[in-house]
Amino acid sequence: MTKKIGIILGSTRQGRISPAIAEWVTAGVAKHPELSAEMLDLGAINLPLFNEPTIPSVAPGVSEAAIAWREKVTSLDAFIILTAEYNAGYPAPLKNALDYLKTEWANRPIFTISYGFSGGASAAHQLSEVLIRIGTVQIEPNIAILIGDKLNANGGIDDPHASLAIHDEELDIALNAIEAWAPTEEPTDV
């Protein structure tokens, strides 16, 4: 049975490089016949700031946005989160997307790819704390992409496959772990 991976683009700003990184990730997933990928671009999904009447650990969100996001997340088996690092943290839209749900994240494998001038280390660390709290299964090793030497004059990545090839083995290890992962009977709330 094919496992469906949601690739979450955590940055929504114009000029972001996550679409180029997602292109490289999608090509890596395509090399694994037991996996398929679906892009979850938070910029396109455009979740409003979390403002549900209750918190997700008490009751599911009731807004159209919350229901659609919950249905999308629960339709997938695993996730790869692409996170930029802004001011030593991960982007607010990513935190917002995580906060909309609680038990839906539990026991789901999540692999993080961070990027920034320091590889996104601070963002990855902060994100890891949240992922632990919501009960995900974190797939290691995370990938930290140093972007300084990969950016063109416009701040983009011209050829993500060539620029990110140094991380191909790490991506393959993570994808193998997702392939091998077996879910528990029922998600647990943490």
Positions of predicted regions on the chain:
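Feature detects long, helix-prone N-terminal segments enriched in hydrophobes
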Residues: 6, 38-39, 72-76
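N-terminal beta1-alpha1 ligand-phosphate binding loop
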Residues: 2-33
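N-terminal beta-loop-helix "entrance" segment that forms/cooperates
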Residues: 43-60, 151-156
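Glycine-rich phosphate/pyrophosphate-binding loop and the adjoining helix
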Residues: 137-190
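Helix-loop-strand module that forms the ligand-binding subsite of alpha/beta enzymes
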Residues: 59-135
